[in-house]
Amino acid sequence: MRAYLDYNSTSPLRSEAKQAMIDAMTVVGNPSSVHLEGRAAKTLIENARLKIAEAIGAVGADIIFTSGATESAALALAGRDIVCSRLEHEAVTSWCSAKLSADRLGIVEIKEPQQSALQVANSETGILQKHVQGIW
């Protein structure tokens, strides 16, 4: 019997999330359109935005949907003077003005968390960084 132990990288989809995706895929409409189908699509998106915001203690306006991690990193980091670790994905390091090395245990020391981009858990090594400060 096999056991999947790479949850740090990717975890199986929860059945509730799968059902929500299936339900959402039945809604056809451009959320920017004013017709009934468009309004239904927009309502679906806005309800999802509010659920996510509530789950993390934010407001709906703070939630931005993107196509993936690379686009998200660009949105968050472009135009900023950011320090990151050499362990980050290229989607992050390509925006960093300086790159920090890790110690022999894979831990990165961050001196200025407000100007830093550092993943908490590395998806390849599973190493958890010890920092808890930062801007959310």
Please name every model-derived segment.
Residues 1-136:
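Pyridoxal 5′-phosphate
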